[in-house]
Every structure is written in C-alpha cells, then in structure tokens.
Amino acid sequence: MVSTLDDTKRNAIAEKLADAKLLQELIIENQERFLRESTDNEISNRIRDFLEDDRKNLGIIETVIVQYGIQKEPRQTVREMVDQVRQLMQGSQLNFFEKVAQHELLKHKQVMSGLLVHKAAQKVGADVLAAIGPLNTVNFENRAHQEQLKGILEILGVRELTGQDADQGIWGRVQDAIAAFSGAVGSAVTQGSDKQDMNIQDVIRMDHNKVNILFTELQQSNDPQKIQEYFGQIYKDLTAHAEAEEEVLYPRVRSFYGEGDTQELYDEQSEMKRLLEQIKAISPSAPEFKDRVRQLADIVMDHVRQEESTLFAAIRNNLSSEQTEQWATEFKAAKSKIQQRLGGQATGAGV
C-alpha cells in the first residue's frame, strides 16, 4: 500500500509559502502604519500604491497556497522575527527613516523567499511549478517596490542628516531601474486589474491543469518513491477539489445546469473517490498500480472535459463576473479548510 501521502520536500515548500504569507501580512501592516506617520505627500502616494499592490499580492499568495495543496503553519523562527519587527514598528525606538529601512529589508527577504521557492519547485516537479507560477508576479512587484523604497530612504536619509530635501533626480533613477524589469510584471490572477479575485472557472481550470501534470509525472516515473510522492499529491488535490466543488459549486449550479447533468458530476466524483481509496491500498511498486492510476486519470479527464465545456458555459451564461469571483473566493476557502483537515490526518505506515 501507499505508506504515506506526505513528502518532505513538498512540506518544506509549503512551510516557506506559509512564511511568505505571514511576512506579506506584516508588510501590509507596516505600510498602513507608514501612511499614518508620513508627512510627505509624494512618499505617502508611493506607499499607498505599495499597499494596493501588496493587498492584491496577499491574495495571490493565498491562491498559490491553496493551489499548491499543502497547508502548513509558518516556522517558529519566522513568527518570532515578525513579532520582533512588529514591536519595533509600533514603538518609538526607531525614527521613520529607520522603520522604512527595516521594511526594505523585509521586502528583500520576501523577494529571496519567492526566488528560492521557484528554484526548489524546479527540483520537485512540474506540478509544483504550475501551482506556484503566479508567485512570479509577487516577486517582480517586490523588486519594483525595493527600488522605490531605496528612493524613499535616500530622501528621508538626506533630510535626517541635513534638514534639507535631496536632489530631485532620485525618482527618475528609480523609474529607470524599475523599467529594466517591469515589462515582465503581470498575472492571470488579480494583479494589474480591478478584479478582487479570479473567477470560479479559472480556479477550477488551474486545479485541472495541475492534476493532469501530476498524472503525467507519475506515469513517466519508474521510481517507486517518486510514484508514491506524486500519488500522495494527486490523492490530496483530488479529494480537496471534489469536496470543495460538492460544497460550494454543485448545489448552486443544479438550478440552471440541470438535474441530470449535475448528478452526473456527483457520480463521476464518487467513482473517482472510490478508485483513490483502492489505489491507496496498492504498493506503488506493484504492476497494477499504474494501471489503476491510468483508469483514474481517464475518469478524471472525462470529468474535466464536461466541466470545462458545458458547465463553464452554463456558469458564464447565468452568473455575473462579480458572482463568479465570489464563488472562487468561497471555493478556495473551502479547499483550504479541507487541506488543513487532510494535513492533520495520520499519514504514516498503514495509510
């Protein structure tokens, strides 16, 4: 049987993503405080722009965590560091310049974390790269913010040392630095638009793409340990996806998608869950393991084709953009709770 659904490398990346979410929340908290403390209109406007970007980026990080499929808590050392920085920002030990300098270091830490997650994903699997893809937007935004924060620090530092304003060429240099890489900024998630979230079709399609990659990776591998790793992720992803659809989506579409078509979706997922449990009881090195996985993949991809054609069309024809975005938010929240439950279940030998 499959001895564990967990994988050490994937869990380590999940912890890094949890760290990034906690840091992003601190970054937002700092910038809200800076707006209350700043007396410079130009600096306030820059920080206000940062805040808008970073609130969206927090949504992107939350989406990536759900798509990644493993929920973890931030590391204790990171929680302690966040508490220490929060105390410094709330206190009077540091002046405004020093607080912004500490904040720029946080941005740098967030950039490096994002790059490390991307590099680690290249080693773990194509499905991980697919799940964390939107983090590229967060990384580019943070690099752009770093350049602007350097400009802010130059202005504040000159004022502190001389009591006078710095030369006006600072912002021009900052904009030139940003332009060197800003062309790569963009995201299919929420950044660069007025959307508050992805729509439900986009979120479900991302799940479909990821599990398809996992099936391909599993079938191409001859390493029982990697096969076990891929199946563990397939099991958790499909379980969370199916339960979230049955909680948030299917009951709501029945009225306009039709009783028969909706019931077919339920029936397909019931068969999928049955096969998942059967496969979990088979050793990854057994000859029939891949055959059963192939059977599961066929059922899943038939299900995918139905959802992405007729179901998505029915959703487009019956819901507003705001409604599909709200459904996406609720779907991700439901998946997150299910993932936390799955992560808390015993996954040692005998699973």
UniProtKB/Swiss-Prot annotation:
The keyword Transcription regulation does not apply. Transmembrane segments: none annotated. Keywords: Iron, Metal-binding, Stress response. Fe cation 2 binds at residues 245, 303. GO terms for molecular function: metal ion binding. InterPro entries: Hemerythrin-like. The keyword Glycosyltransferase does not apply. Gene3D superfamilies: nmb1532 protein domain like (1.20.120.520). Induction: By desiccation. Fe cation 1 binds at residues 241, 245. Disulfide bonds: none annotated. Belongs to the hemerythrin family. Acts as a DNA nickase. This is DNA nickase. It comes from Nostoc sp. (strain PCC 7120 / SAG 25.82 / UTEX 2576).
